Regions:
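Accessory beta-strand-rich segments of carbohydrate-active enzymes
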Residues: 1-23, 37-41, 65, 85-190, ...
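Aromatic- and glycine-enriched glycan-recognition loops and surfaces
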Residues: 87-94, 246-248, 300-332
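Extended acidic/polar, glycine-enriched regions
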Residues: 144-150, 206-274
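N-terminal carbohydrate-binding accessory modules
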Residues: 191-197, 241, 253-315, 336
Length: 451
């Protein structure tokens, strides 16, 4: 078994997931979007010395840049279904570019917001780490690999890996570095992870380092506080409430180590009534929703902020109030716009294993986990199921628009989704959790929605 075919080892040296933010102040963000050197290999095992480079735009999908053709499939995998193995002939794109570091003594991080399907990162010729999970943010500490001045990043991107068995979404299949990629140079002692929640009239801010905080209502400063034990609480008398129709947000700024982290938060409650009504702020709400794919006829999975705003404005014109991010997390900015423009979001984990219904075609179109080795019931996939839901939750846990987590799409239902639900409910006592296939995978004792 090759390392990229092992579901129990789908990353090396990738940092734990955290809330998404771009610090201001002393942090330096070095955007690596733009032209990269590029070499394409039909067989990635032969991706050795590269004497002649071509160039490619990043972010992009290489199938739309002249390397291979776009491939659409709904149910079937684009390769023989023999989990966790992928074809020996595994195309690979090699990306390389240089970047400047002003101060090599700072903490330095390399961030992928989306790369498909597996990426190996090298800095200045030294191996840093690898990651799977195409639509999930991956961050690496490269402090020990860089120095002041010119540095070089090289990324090997495999077309397929064991994680491809969990990414059988009904869509065109693409590969490459298809979302933003950048370097963050940050001061020592900086905040890494933050969380901001509301409880009744309180806004509760927590972080893994001490900080000062400010709360704003529009441009008006309401209050300043210093954290105690990494926690600061603001009380807002008679707060304005957030709904999809009235998306009222307050602004929180956290100050630490010369950095400023700015996030927005709204007051809203989520309940299921005794009559099984969805209540937002105590009022019954009917979800009028759509599935939204990250897809563009010319750019594939690469979506700009303008693309997202265009789609959301169209939804507003059509009186849509809910978005299911089918079937994976979108780029982070999409959820900022959902917060600001007013949408209820069902945020879906990057998991779909639909192709297993064809592996057991004699059973027919049903998700029969008792007569097949579906990933949802196989122990070897449990770590990856949990890793993907953890990364989904941790990145987007602050967003007010997110009212429900989804464990994935068309993947049957088994112990691995149950483990995902248990993990979610241990971390989030407010939002709903959802498994799309639970009700049709067998017993009605397996509910589709979990409170």
């Amino acid at each position: 078994m090759r390392i990229y075919e092992n579901p129990k080892s789908t990353s090396e040296n990738r940092l734990n997931a955290r809330s998404w933010y771009i610090p201001e102040g002393s942090c330096k963000q070095i955007m690596l979007n733009g032209e990269w050197r590029f070499a394409f290999f039909e067989n990635g095992d032969r991706a050795g010395n590269i004497e002649e480079w071509e160039t490619i735009e990043v972010p992009s999908c290489w199938q739309l840049k002249g390397y291979e053709n776009p491939n659409y499939t709904n149910i079937n995998y684009p390769f023989p279904c023999d989990p966790p193995y992928v074809p020996d002939i595994n195309p690979t794109g090699v990306y390389e570019r240089s970047f400047q570091i002003e101060d090599g003594s700072l903490k330095t991080y390399f961030v992928f917001e989306g790369v498909s399907s597996e990426a190996e990162l090298y800095i200045n010729g030294k191996y840093v780490g690898r990651t799977q999970g195409s639509r999930l943010t991956a961050e690496f500490d490269i402090t020990e690999f860089v120095s002041s001045g010119t540095n070089t990043a090289r990324v090997y991107v495999r077309k397929w890996c064991c994680g491809s068995y969990l990414e059988d979404q009904d869509a065109f299949r693409y590969n490459g570095i298809f979302r933003d990629v950048y370097v963050l140079s940050r001061p020592h002692g900086h905040i890494f992870d933050i969380d901001i929640k509301t409880e009744e009239n309180d806004i509760i801010c927590t972080a893994d380092a001490e900080f000062s905080a400010e709360l704003y209502d529009g441009d008006a400063l309401l209050e300043r506080r210093d954290s105690v034990g990494g926690k600061a609480v603001f009380t807002v008398n008679e707060p304005s409430l957030w709904t999809a129709e009235t998306p009222y947000l307050y602004t929180v700024k956290l100050y630490a180590a010369g950095e400023i982290i700015t996030r927005k938060i709204g007051f809203r409650t989520i309940k299921i009534s005794s009559d099984y009504e969805l209540l937002i702020n105590g009022t019954p709400v009917k979800l009028k929703g759509v599935n939204h794919h990250d897809t563009d006829p010319y750019k594939g999975w690469t979506m700009s902020e303008e693309d997202y705003v265009r789609d959301l404005k169209l939804m507003k014109e059509l009186n849509i109030n809910t978005v299911r991010t089918s079937h994976y997390p979108p780029a982070p900015k999409f959820l900022d716009y959902c917060d600001e423009m007013g949408f209820y979001v069902i945020l879906e984990c990057d998991i779909e294993t639909h192709g297993f219904v064809r592996r057991y075609a004699d059973i027919g179109y049903k998700f029969d986990t008792e007569n097949g080795d579906w990933p949802c019931v196989e122990e070897m996939w449990k770590k990856e199921f949990l890793d993907r839901i953890e990364r989904t939750y941790e990145r987007d846990k602050i967003h007010t628009s997110v009212i429900m987590w989804s464990t994935g799409n068309e993947s049957a239902y088994g112990v691995n989704q149950a483990a995902q639900i248990d993990w979610l409910k241990s971390r989030d006592k407010v939002r709903l959790a959802h498994c799309e296939d639970a009700s049709r995978a067998g017993s009605q004792e397996k509910p589709t929605y979990f409170q």
